[in-house]
Amino acid sequence: EESENNDNFEIIELTEDTETSEQFDTPKGAVSNGYYVINVTKSEISSTSAYAAIQSALDEAQENATTDLPYKVFVDPGKYSLTQGLRIYSNTYLCLTGVTLTRNKGSNYNMIKVGDSNDTHSGYYYQNITIDGGIWNENGNSNTAIKICHTQNITLMNATLKNCSNSHLMEIAGNNGITIQNCNFADQALSTSAKPYTYEAKIG
């Protein structure tokens, strides 16, 4: 894991699980606990792909979520292949309780990134983002699983990041107010030919 130029960085250990009843009791389009709710179902994922179904919900949140009415995206529990990297934007809560996402073997993309790949935004452009839950399985690939840059008020909680090779499980830089809560980082492999910085952990 790597962190550079982050203000108010906090790592917290908790033991209580996140409540999941809201996911199953709240229909799509309802407002619950201050969030507009979107449910990504197994049938949607089966008819397209995990990437297409989840990213469609995140794109809807990008277009419509506000600080006054943020969006919460629930993904049905299950094990899914992630064929492309997800993008998440401001005022969005992504709930992945009971979800395992596995990157395609030999692929080259971040599993999830704040903002777009060609972003030129600076400062704390993206705000109020939560990634809650999920097993993020890098499947032995060598690209960072989660990348978080130029954000304010972001939380990563109840997640497991694992199984990357010669790379970071997570990179964070240029942020203000990050909470990492009840997360596990595991199975990061380093080959003898890899450069040392691919295995470092820096917080500063």
State where each predicted segment sits.
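Sec-dependent signal peptide cleavage junction
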Residues: 1-4
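Right-handed parallel beta-helix/beta-solenoid
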Residues: 9-56
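A structural detector for beta-sheet-dominated domains
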Residues: 12-15, 41, 76, 83, ...
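N-terminal extracellular ligand-recognition/capping segment immediately after the signal peptide
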Residues: 45-51, 67-109, 136, 141, ...
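Short, T/G/N/S-enriched strand-turn elements that build extracellular solenoid repeat scaffolds
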Residues: 54-66, 81-91, 104, 119-124, ...
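N-terminal adaptor/linker regions at the entrance to substrate-recognition repeat cores
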Residues: 68, 101-103, 109-138, 146
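Short glycine/acidic-rich loop motifs that flank beta-strands on beta-rich extracellular proteins
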Residues: 82-85, 103-109, 136-145, 164-172, ...
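Right-handed parallel beta-helix
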Residues: 93, 97-100, 124-138, 152-163, ...
